[in-house]
From Swiss-Prot:
Lineage: Bacteria, Pseudomonadati, Pseudomonadota, Gammaproteobacteria, Vibrionales
Protein name as annotated: Small ribosomal subunit protein uS13
Record-linked Gene3D superfamilies: 1.10.8.50, 30s ribosomal protein s13, domain 2
Entry's family note: Belongs to the universal ribosomal protein uS13 family.
Gene Ontology CC annotation, any one: small ribosomal subunit
Pfam families, per the entry: Ribosomal_S13
Length: 118
C-alpha cells in the first residue's frame, strides 16, 4: 500500500479513485493532479513505480489536505462563533445556517425531539 499524506492509499483501485481516499481531494482535484503529472487515470496504484508515487506525494503536498484542512475548517467555524455574526450564532445553536425552515424539518441539524415537560 502506498502512503500519501499520512493515508494508506488502496492498491487495487484506479489512481483517480484511490486519491479520493485523502480528505480534501475529490474526483476533480484527483484528475487535475494526475493530469499535471502525466499519469493515466486508469492506472492502478499497484502498477505505479516508486518514482511516480513520489511525484504523487509532491502533487498532493501542494494542496491543503487531511489534518491541516480539518483544522482550517474548524478554525473558520470557531472564528464565526467568536465574531457573534448570524452564521456563528446558528452554529452555536446547532441550527441550519442558510435560511432553511426550522418550524418543521431540520431534524438532522437539531437532533432528536426533546419532549415538553408538563
Amino acid at each position: 500500500m502506498a502512503r500519501i499524506a499520512g493515508i494508506n492509499i488502496p492498491d487495487h483501485k484506479h489512481a483517480v479513485i484511490a486519491l479520493t481516499a485523502i480528505y480534501g481531494i475529490g474526483k476533480t482535484r484527483s484528475k487535475a493532479i494526475l493530469a499535471d503529472l502525466g499519469i493515466a487515470e486508469s492506472v492502478k496504484i499497484s502498477e505505479l513505480t516508486e518514482e511516480q508515487i513520489d511525484q504523487l506525494r509532491d502533487g498532493v503536498a501542494k494542496y491543503t489536505v487531511e489534518g491541516d484542512l480539518r483544522r482550517e475548517v474548524s478554525m473558520n467555524i470557531k472564528r464565526l462563533m467568536d465574531l457573534g455574526c448570524y452564521r456563528g450564532l446558528r452554529h452555536r445553536r446547532s441550527l441550519p445556517l442558510r435560511g432553511q425552515r426550522t418550524k418543521t424539518n431540520a431534524r438532522t441539524r437539531k437532533g432528536p425531539r426533546k419532549p415538553i415537560k408538563k
